[in-house]
A protein has these predicted regions:
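Catalytic cores of secreted/periplasmic or lumenal enzymes
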Residues: 2-328
Length: 328
């Protein structure tokens, strides 16, 4: 005679299965993933990033931005790096959100060096992640132990870029919701925006705060400086007209960004909102007061970002050329 089934036992078994499945999926990323398949991989990437930084310091900033733009859209899967091809992929780089991004050609330089050592082994997604890690360290930021084992996407997500990556004119509520969608909490979001301590903002992205009248929340003296940097309300997008995010330490990831926005010297409207919104202001104040705390939270935030929904296991592929899908 068949034994009666216990509904609660079935539910418990299902929950156990789901928990194990989730755990196994998350564990496919690991520290030193290439220790056996390509033991020199991380050293080669670090060496290439350092050499490029010594020649072109702004490359380190590009690697940090690449990580953000890649991971915010679906997954940390190097979909950002794909080039447009006729009747095929449309590059995410064609989106207006990618305006001002550069140095992609040097990703190919890093990839070529790794391929020479270990062909078809190290993913472009891991190169994006590790180059950001090494770039952060070169820019005076924290040293971060990062997991690897990501695989590369077989498609571009250009239609999802606009809905995934916050715009400089977005409200702080929308920005927080975009990060929350990928499980990045408020404190980590405030820390990630500290990446604005390096690099620059193009005039096309800040003139709305200057013309026809100056944004009342902007420090008047700083506004005059910005108007000298951006003397027209209609700058040519192709012209390299910009202002540094941080005038004091423009190429160091430090807490000066938070000190600046507390003085109403942030370049973007989201910077001003970050300093004044009650959900974020306490973290801004704390980071402005304590650079070590900022670095700790920045490290945590970068890890959360870099481990967003990775493609791993037997999914995706390991691209031979980061710009194009592998030929079938």
């Amino acid at each position: 005679m068949a034994m009666p089934t216990n509904p609660s036992s079935n539910i418990s078994f299902l929950l156990l299965f789901l928990l194990l499945h989730f755990h196994l999926g998350k564990s496919e990323l690991e520290v030193n993933y290439y220790s056996k398949s390509c033991p020199k991989a991380e050293d080669i990437i670090k060496q290439q990033v350092t050499q490029l930084y010594n020649k072109h310091g702004n490359t380190a900033v590009s690697w940090v931005r690449n990580l953000f733009h890649d991971c915010m859209v679906k997954s940390c899967d190097a979909s950002l790096l794909l080039e447009t091809v006729p009747n095929g992929v449309v590059s995410e780089k064609t989106s207006s959100r990618s305006f001002g991004m550069r140095n992609f050609k040097y990703v190919n330089t890093i990839k070529a060096a790794v391929e020479q050592e270990c062909p078809s082994t190290v993913s472009c997604a891991d190169i994006v992640a590790l180059s950001a890690r090494d770039g952060i360290a070169l820019l005076g930021g924290p040293s971060i132990e990062m997991k690897t084992g990501r695989r590369d996407s077989k498609e571009s997500y250009v239609t999802e870029v606009e809905d995934s990556i916050p715009n400089h004119n977005d409200s702080i509520s929308l920005v927080l919701s975009r990060f929350q969608a990928i499980a990045i909490d408020v404190e980590a979001t405030v820390a990630l925006l500290g990446a604005h301590s390096v690099g620059r903002v193009h005039c096309v992205n800040l003139v709305k705060r200057l013309y026809p009248t100056v944004d009342k929340t902007l420090d008047p003296t700083h506004a005059e400086y910005l108007k000298r940097r951006c003397p027209t309300p209609n700058p040519d997008p192709k012209a390299v007209m910009y202002s540094r995010n941080d005038l004091k330490t423009p190429m160091i990831i430090d807490n000066n960004y938070y000190k600046n926005i507390l003085q109403h010297k942030g370049l973007l409207s989201v910077d001003e909102q970050l300093a004044t919104d009650p959900r974020t202001a306490p973290y801004v104040q704390k980071m402005a007061n304590d650079n070590e705390y900022f670095h700790q939270q920045f490290s945590r935030a970068i890890l959360l970002l870099s481990e967003t929904n990775p493609i791993s296991g037997d999914q995706g592929e390991i691209r031979k050329d980061c710009r194009y899908l592998n030929a079938n």
